[in-house]
UniProtKB/Swiss-Prot annotation:
NCBIfam families reported in the protein's UniProt record: rplA_bact (TIGR01169)
Record keywords: Repressor, Ribonucleoprotein, Ribosomal protein, RNA-binding, rRNA-binding, Translation regulation, tRNA-binding
MF annotations from Gene Ontology: rRNA binding; structural constituent of ribosome; tRNA binding
Function: Binds directly to 23S rRNA. The L1 stalk is quite mobile in the ribosome, and is involved in E site tRNA release.
Species of origin: Sinorhizobium fredii (strain NBRC 101917 / NGR234)
UniProt name for this protein: Large ribosomal subunit protein uL1
HAMAP family recorded: Ribosomal_uL1_B
Family in the record: Belongs to the universal ribosomal protein uL1 family.
Keyword rRNA-binding assigned: yes
An example Gene Ontology CC term for this record: cytosolic large ribosomal subunit
GO biological process, one term: translation
Domain of life of the source: Bacteria
Oligomeric and partner information: Part of the 50S ribosomal subunit.
Length: 232
């Protein structure tokens, strides 16, 4: 514990918690302070001027990060027949129908993202209480209920990130690894921010992007000037 506390304290040296950094400087500082013995995830959090308790202020969507996420994503597909074969050929890790529903109902979830063909949704709907809280329920709004399972699987494997605003008006996501070069991280962060901006709901009033911050898994958070993200 003493070693961990010392490392955390050292990672905060040279960081001004009150300062608002430009994106390039913030990425450099975060990378320098990602000193854990594993490849830390770089995370972005955006505080939005919305109240998600109101339906017209919900923010959700999906973005394909140009440089991927750096993590291996296991994909499950609910499909039958030719579509099941298509999913397997595209690289899905788990494919099934009633059999897969039973497995998930039994508590075994060995995947990170879930896709379904439209005809499977009455069946998959039974899993709402299991998949919903984990943010895995297939949804046509984010492209996970689709007949084009090949594109959906490849997108999921290739860096697709879903986002959804939380109760406090915060939307966050992992946008890469500390091992990524700074340019790749900046491109991913800008792509994520752009997607969140484009998902601005009609009910949002006033300042939409209130605050932005980035951090590594074990490192300190740094505030970012939204203007350096091309965010208004």
């Amino acid at each position: 514990m003493a070693k961990i506390a010392k490392r955390v304290q050292k990672s905060r040296e040279g960081i001004d918690p009150a300062k608002v950094y430009g994106l390039t400087e913030a990425v450099t500082l975060v990378k320098e302070r990602a000193t854990a013995k594993f490849d830390e995830t770089i995370e972005v959090a955006m505080n939005l001027g919305v109240d998600p308790r109101h339906a017209d202020q919900m923010v959700r969507g999906v973005v394909n990060l140009p440089n991927g996420t750096g993590r291996s994503v296991r994909v499950a597909v609910f499909a039958r027949g030719a579509k099941a074969d298509e999913a397997k050929a595209a690289g899905a890790d788990v494919v099934g129908a009633e059999d897969l529903v039973e497995i998930v109902q039994g508590g075994k979830i060995d995947f990170d993202r879930c896709i379904a063909t439209p005809d499977m949704m009455p069946l998959v709907g039974r899993l709402g209480k299991v998949l919903g809280p984990r943010g895995m329920m297939p949804n046509p709004k984010v492209g996970t209920v689709t007949m084009d399972v090949t594109a959906a699987v490849k997108s999921s494997k290739g860096g697709a990130v879903e986002f959804r605003v939380e109760k406090a008006g915060i939307v966050h996501a992992g946008v890469g690894k500390a091992s990524f070069d700074a340019k790749a991280l900046e491109e991913n962060i800008r792509a994520f921010a752009d997607a969140v901006i484009k998902a601005k709901p009609t009910g949002a009033k006033g300042n939409y992007v209130k605050r932005v911050a980035i951090s590594s898994t074990m490192g300190p958070g740094l505030k970012i000037d939204p203007a350096t993200l091309s965010v208004a």
